[in-house]
Design a protein with these regions (language model features):
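Non-ligating segments of multi-cofactor redox enzymes
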Residues: 1-257, 263-295
Length: 295
């Protein structure tokens, strides 16, 4: 076992919260805009950020990849976007759902909510709901923006408009506080989206990351690359004693020993910290935490 790699893996897992905080700050660097009710519209807004972060957030540094993708497929001049597709492939192949675990602002928001003291419920018996996010990806992110269009052939960003709670949290609420015109224009759709946000908040206190597990289309996209991503979690079979502590620690309901590269794994490192034999670590570009592993 490579002790240095194991030590680095444990350190990375331990400082995950700080990395999430820094990632959220960098993703929303224009903080003064929160008090002005204005959206930053500089050149950086043409670049997508890796996690789910609303374009309409006054502090947002860049564009939301899901919002950008819907803008492309819903355009009357729709054509295959090499930029957006390449963005998903590059990040997916490189990091997979590590982005969900370390770099996504809304993922961190759910983590903080789940730390609120109180009774916590398991999602182990709700595994079929995992597939809902793929349905949402196909229907609300791809098909509806393409097929349901207005008189000039433009489709709505259906996921952003009707489902995404991050848009309300980061966009509508801050903008309405700082902008009287926007505040006066709020209607039933805003109320409906607020109900979704409240539901996600309550569920996040009870369950671990319900939005990530069941709803998020961005997580659905990144999950498709988990088995082939360069960054993975690997188990040293020569050290593993089958105690099951890693799977008990996994809040994403993954059997770590059997499927460490499962689509639901967000690379949070909980299993690394829980392993009493230091048999689990991060692996990048095929370099395993097992000395004699030549994969």
């Amino acid at each position: 076992m490579d002790k240095e790699k194991k030590l680095l893996s444990r350190k990375l897992a331990k400082v995950r919260g700080w990395i999430q905080a820094v990632a959220t700050l960098l993703t929303n660097i224009h903080i003064p805009n929160l008090f002005k009710g204005k959206i930053y519209q500089g050149n950086a807004k043409t670049v997508c950020v890796p996690g789910l972060n609303c374009y309409s957030c006054p502090a947002a540094t860049g564009a939301c990849p899901i919002g950008a993708f819907q803008a492309v497929v819903g355009s009357s001049r729709f054509k295959f976007s090499y930029y957006i597709t390449g963005f998903f492939i590059l990040l997916g192949v490189t990091l997979g759902r590590f982005i969900c675990g370390f770099l996504c602002p809304f993922g961190w928001f759910q983590d903080l909510l789940h730390k609120i003291p109180g009774k916590k419920l398991s999602t182990a018996k709700l595994k079929p709901l995992r597939y809902l996010k793929y349905v949402i990806l196909i229907v609300f992110v791809i098909l509806l923006p393409m097929l349901v269009t207005n008189s000039i052939g433009m489709g709505d960003p259906f996921f952003c408009k009707y489902i995404c709670p991050q848009g309300v949290l980061e966009g509508a609420i801050p903008l309405s506080i700082g902008n009287a015109a926007i505040r006066s224009a709020l209607g039933k759709l805003f109320s409906f989206k607020c109900m979704i946000l409240i539901a996600v908040i309550v569920l996040s206190i009870l369950f671990y990351r319900p939005f990530c597990k069941w709803i998020c289309p961005l997580g659905a996209i990144y999950s498709l690359f988990n088995k082939v991503s360069l960054l993975k979690i690997t188990v040293d079979s020569s050290k593993c004693v089958g105690c099951g502590q890693c799977s008990k620690a996994c809040k994403m309901d993954v059997d770590v020993c059997k499927t460490p590269d499962h689509p639901e794994c967000i690379r949070c490192g909980a299993c690394i910290k829980a392993c009493p034999k230091d048999a689990i670590c991060y692996r990048f570009m095929g370099k395993s935490c097992q000395k004699n592993d030549n994969r």
